[in-house]
Amino acid sequence: NTIITEQLSRVCMGIGLNIVAATFGCENLLYYGTEEQKKTYMPPVCAGDTVCAGAYTEPNAGTDVAGYKTRAVADGDDFVLTGNKMFITNGTVCDWMVVQAITDPEEKVHKSFSQFIVPADSPGIVRTKIKGKLGIRASDTAEIALDGVRVPKANLVGKRGAGFYQLMHFFDTTRVLVAAQGIGLSQACLDESVKYCKERTVFGKALGTYQITMQKLTEMWIRIEALRNMTYKAAVSLDSGKPDYHLSAMAKYFAGQTAVFCANLAVELHGGYGYIEEYKVQKWYRDAKILELYEGTKEAEVMTLGKVLMS
């Protein structure tokens, strides 16, 4: 998945994200779902027959996971969910979603959340496509409103009250694929810039023959190789069953920095041509910024790693 995501993101990071997001929510079922849940929901997703989503982020709480307000109240054999979710990938195209909601408000905040499988066509759900995004426009993003949505108690994923910790586990695994998006986009910026600098003539010489140009291209190359090695190492740790979540956080953090850095230099090297739609680098420039925002902001990654160092 890491290699495929990287390669697709070299052309369009939105498409690369669609590969990452194709199983959003399934990770929760894989780690914490019952055998019945896995047999019912996962095979159709793997076959490409259904689409899932992870409905976690809310209008007033993104990185602040403990600030989510959506409620799930037990009522007989059901839970009734009410709340709003924001910036949900696959939100308008999914067949079902895993929703994070408060079930036990009297408990400490980290033990108050649970997760539920919610069919997307359930009565009380309204899904609205978010338009006008800066980048990753090939990826579906939506706001989802839940108003008295009923799901059976059998749709509880994992343990009641363990939703916060289950969500943290989800982020730990998906950060590697976000880092892979950063590799692909950054590599595309470098490749396109090298090509342009060989062809573009400035003061009678190829742009790439100037030392300042070489410095910019070389710095891009060094950062990309460092990011690739860090990300691949984190991916190998996941595949081996011994995940290094600290390394995943580092890779995700560095991916955002590297992508923004490379995209910015790519536009600079292209000059005015980098600012028009005819050239690819303007798209990569717009796409890059999201890598510092979703699946945990760059500040959140620093805070996570900093706490490890200080513990």
What is each of the regions a protein language model found here?
Residues 1-11, 15-20, 32-37, 44-49, ...:
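Alpha-helical interface subdomain recognition
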Residues 5-9, 100-101, 118-123, 148-151:
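Short Ser/Thr-interspersed hydrophobic loop/turn segments at strand-loop and sheet-helix junctions
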Residues 18, 45, 60-63, 87-90, ...:
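Short Gly/Pro-enriched turn/cap motifs at secondary-structure boundaries
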Residues 26-32, 54, 66, 106:
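Flexible, glycine-rich active-site loops centered on histidine and acidic residues
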Residues 31-33, 73, 99-103, 117-119, ...:
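Short beta-strand-to-turn element immediately C-terminal to the catalytic PLP-Schiff-base lysine
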Residues 48-56, 100:
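A short, Trp-centered hydrophobic/proline-enriched beta-strand micro-motif
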Residues 67, 121-152:
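Flexible, small-/acidic-enriched active-site or ligand-binding loops
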Residues 78, 82-127:
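A short core secondary-structure module
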